[in-house]
A protein has these predicted regions:
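Classical Sec-dependent N-terminal signal peptides that target proteins to the secretory pathway
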Residues: 1-20
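Lipolytic serine-hydrolase domain surface
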Residues: 37, 228-230, 249-388
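Short, acidic Gly/Pro/Ser/Thr-rich loop/turn segments
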Residues: 33-35, 88-90, 165, 267, ...
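Hydrophobic/aromatic beta-strand patches that form the interior of the parallel beta-sheet core
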Residues: 26, 81-83, 156, 258-260, ...
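Extreme N-terminal starter segment of soluble prokaryotic enzymes
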Residues: 21-25
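Active-site catalytic motif of lipid deacylating hydrolases and related acyltransferases
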Residues: 28-151
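Serine-dependent carboxylesterase/thioesterase catalytic core
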Residues: 29-33, 126-292
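Amphipathic alpha-helical scaffolding segments
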Residues: 40-49, 169-176, 316-317
Length: 388
């Protein structure tokens, strides 16, 4: 009996070791997926893409060379994890369609048709951008990430189309890149508040944990300002709960390994982040610093024929990112890389919805960009190639 028990314990330990670096791929839907037909289209596309992507990922030995955490025990969950938020916008879209029915009697057929297309394809993208809609989606996504983490899985988020808004906001709101003491100093809080914070140090936290839904420290305004709770005594009391709220609100520590955005229109909808006067840039700098220092990668992969696949930025080396941000990045290992020139061999009218049917081409590009992105940022020989 003892021998059997010992064997069981050894097998359990072996299983835990083997699964230590198992990855879950979480796929996040885009716009126009809020009815049953489109939901099924999206989910069927993911189920066809995932095994092809998984196979290419596991076969590529260079990934293990450049990403040291992905050692010989690397495994990827066989089933895709599908995070679907499209149903949450359906009630609002139904209201828009009712208003369209009113216009049908007074508009030309061409105008009515154009309005219908705009509403169908852009409504969800506009809907999910609104803070009061986005925040519950982020909390639900975080529960999905936590569930995978509780099973011993690291995660890579795959954001499709308007799903790239969700991945961006998830990193912005859920990564623990905020040092509370430095935050209060930056915001020029009252001296007695800063002294209180220094006397009661807390761990790094995330934007979500600071909000009134959690710790009640403050909220980010539409202008990009973090507005502190004006009740100083309540602010101090709330501050002491930050560590607990960080545990509840922020991404599980070390579990989010990367993001792959594709069919990405994020530049079109979030162009204000390029404005130096927009204060969210301060937090974006901290977020990117965290990404680079914690070995997280952000890839953007677009078909060149995709009219909604916008390049996110010019590719920069790790040193150039540091210079551009104006912050010190210590021992960077993260990757931020854009490849918006993937040839899908599809016409422009079909390219945005062809990432599933052209899954071989798309999967090959993702795996190639994992490697080339790392080499671009850290390999001087690769950086100096004439092609770049």
């Amino acid at each position: 009996m003892r021998k059997i028990l010992l064997i069981f314990i050894l097998m359990l330990g072996f299983n835990l070791v083997c699964n230590a670096n198992e990855l879950s791929f979480i796929y996040i839907n885009g716009s126009n997926n809020n009815d049953e037909k489109m939901k099924n289209w999206y989910e069927n596309g993911v189920k066809k893409l995932h095994p092809v992507l998984r196979k290419r990922f596991l076969k590529n030995s260079a990934i293990k060379k450049y990403y040291k955490e992905f050692d010989d025990k690397l495994a990827i969950k066989e089933e895709p994890v599908i995070f679907f938020w499209g149903d949450k916008s359906k009630t609002d879209l139904d209201f828009v369609k009712k208003q369209l029915d009113i216009s049908k009697a007074i508009s030309s057929s061409g105008a009515y048709f154009a309005r219908s297309l705009i509403a169908q394809y852009l409504h969800d993208a506009i809907w999910v951008q609104k803070t009061h809609n986005m925040l519950p989606v982020l909390d639900e996504l975080n529960k999905t990430v936590e569930k995978e983490a509780d099973s011993g899985h690291d995660v890579i988020l795959y954001g499709y189309s308007a799903g790239t808004f969700v991945t961006y906001q998830y990193l912005f709101n859920k990564l623990p890149y905020i040092n509370p003491e430095k935050l209060f100093e930056t915001l020029n809080a009252d001296k007695d508040v800063i002294d209180f914070v220094k006397a009661n140090p807390r761990k790094n936290t995330c934007i979500s944990a600071l909000s009134y839904n959690y710790a009640g420290i403050g909220n980010v305004s539409s202008a990009g300002h973090l507005i502190l709770n004006q009740n100083k005594e309540q602010l101090k009391k709330n501050y002491l709960t930050i560590d607990d709220m960080t545990q509840k609100a922020c991404a599980p520590e070390g579990r989010v390994k990367g993001v792959v955005n594709f069919a990405c229109p994020i530049v079109l909808f979030y162009s204000d982040i390029s404005d130096n006067n927009y204060e969210l840039n301060f937090y974006n700098r901290l977020m990117i610093k965290y990404i680079m220092e914690h070995g997280i990668f952000m890839l953007t992969v677009n078909f060149r024929e995709d009219p909604l696949g916008f390049p996110t930025s010019r590719n920069l080396t790790a040193k150039e990112i540091e210079q551009r941000l104006g912050v010190s990045i210590n021992n960077p290992t993260g990757v931020i890389y854009d490849d918006s020139g993937v040839w899908s061999k599809r016409c422009f009218a079909l390219a945005h919805t062809s990432y599933w049917t052209a899954r071989g081409t798309f999967s090959k590009a993702i795996v190639k960009d994992f490697v080339n992105g790392y080499k671009f940022q850290y390999d001087e020989k690769y950086q100096n190639r004439k092609e770049l």
